[in-house]
């Protein structure tokens, strides 16, 4: 990877918002192959979401280029609360919850980065040992309150108020960078655009305590916005999680495959490891054959495989194809639950029932007359089979372990009927 210019690659991918010292960083990369860089994440939940992928993709690119990524889990800072991007005070979590979240996040990070040339550390290990007098004497005196007040993350909160606890967060994050630089030879911090002030505070602290010539760099990532101006990272159903129990591989795949033509190339550059020429070719396809959605399919494949592996991708594609073709009978019971989790649902008993009665009783049809008309016109499918016989009996035990009957009306209108009793 000696001839690979990672900074130019990051620029091409639209991954750099600000850098503290590009010339110094280039000089360091030219002379050293041991660059270590980090980003932090506080254990505010028990799963990562796709917003976390934004900094993690930068770390992963550096890892693939032979450098050493480090992730700091904020067991210490997480008990305080980062004010960045918030207009109100965070609700503090219990120590038990924080530790549970730390374990869950660690497992997900190892899945993304492996264990080779990658480290996870917890800032509880150094912040938790520091007493108040040490904090004030060794670090507090190096921070000017007027400078801290001018940081955007604090200034934006002054009108509505900010606690001393959250006000001090930037000092704790600066200490993180200093400790990592001093004890773990970490030279660079990356973060979102709103972390610029915290990152530069850490670099200033390193230079004050270790000397101005100590290598310390910072890089921030642009705010990821969709073409419609809204913030990237949410679906209509809320956050898109990396935990397959919270967001199934199928739902995850669907999030990416449904991206707008105006956004898909930007996301291919940022969230995949495809080469420039591959992405350029897909960009041409978007212009000439947008209806094929080849770029979206490739995006969904690459990101789903990265997060959920080949098995997760295969499951997502199997479910997607079954719903698209209408051939749902080969899905497993679990796959049906995943595929139709957000579809309209109804309940019915376990006994066999005439199709027309079944459709009316489950409120899929408003009347028997309408039900007969739709059946006769071939608009009704039971477990993937088109039924045009109004005397047909629905047997709930016939498929999906007797748990479900899938009714499709027309091309795409699915209802998942849960069988009770």
Curated annotation (Swiss-Prot):
PROSITE patterns: AA_TRNA_LIGASE_I, S4. It comes from Lactobacillus delbrueckii subsp. bulgaricus (strain ATCC 11842 / DSM 20081 / BCRC 10696 / JCM 1002 / NBRC 13953 / NCIMB 11778 / NCTC 12712 / WDCM 00102 / Lb 14). This is Tyrosine--tRNA ligase. The gene is tyrS. The keyword Transmembrane does not apply. GO terms for biological process: tyrosyl-tRNA aminoacylation. Homodimer. Catalyzes the attachment of tyrosine to tRNA(Tyr) in a two-step reaction: tyrosine is first activated by ATP to form Tyr-AMP and then transferred to the acceptor end of tRNA(Tyr). Coiled coil: none annotated. Its EC number is 6.1.1.1. NCBIfam families: tyrS. One of its GO terms (cellular component) is cytosol. Pfam families: SYY_C-terminal (PF22421), tRNA-synt_1b (PF00579). A motif ('HIGH' region) lies at residues 43-52. Belongs to the class-I aminoacyl-tRNA synthetase family. TyrS type 1 subfamily. L-tyrosine binds at residues 38, 169, 173. The lineage of its organism: Bacteria, Bacillati, Bacillota, Bacilli, Lactobacillales.
